[in-house]
Amino acid sequence: MQGELLGSVASELGLKKGTPVTYRAGDQPNNALSLNVLNPGEIAATGGTSGVVYGVNGKVNYDTLSRVNTFAHVNHSADRTRLGVLLCINGVGILNSWVKRNVAPEGISYPALNELAATVPIGSEGLSILPFGNGAERMLQNKQVDCSIHGLNFNIHNKAHIARAAQEGIVFSFKYGMDIMNEMGIDIGVIRAGNANLFLSPIFRDALAGVTGTVIELYDTNGAVGAAKGAGIGAGIYASAEEAFASLKKINVIEPDGLKADKYCGAFEVWKERLEKALA
């Protein structure tokens, strides 16, 4: 327990004076907790306005270029190292939203946008998008690359190609950052995520599983649930984290499709080459 609620604060919040304060965390460690990501090798991810891959490391390690952030996870202790390694990409869902508002047919829904993108083959017939239009990216050593479209051919590409290339570009940025995490000794075999935001897109899920070779597990949970569970664990309402998350419901599993892997990896290499030229 970290303290008790003061009377002045309790009255503002409509809570009882003396309520125990047993848990606090940043948004991504809390999201990881909501997915029961607590032990070395376990991975949580989000795909909102920005995107995050958050892994737990059981040993002290860091990226010498500071492209990812390392800090104590919610269950770290002096005798049991549990460090969170956070990869953050600013230009994720915000790019997909931009395409929906400015490129796709007016009034289109996100499911319809996904269906439009699905009419285009993997690799978007040579079209690549670097999704870095939401500020400098830490994983690119804080360089301001901006968003850019590469390989555009007026005789081949249309709105559907841009819709698919945007999601593939987002996925490839995840892959680029996950390779940095791999260099730190974090082996990413399974990604856990809430069933929300870009993880609702079949194209995004399929591409992420395909290019990284990871299994994606989707759960019916969110950060608010994680915070409540964390407070319950701290207050002793649950005897253990295992008890707290016994009811966590897995609702979908996406396996890498071996028949598509080469196509995704080939498209990633084209994308990566274009990124490296932009960084030069």
List PLM regions with ranges.
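Active-site core segments that coordinate phosphate-bearing ligands/cofactors
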Residues: G7-R192, N197-A280
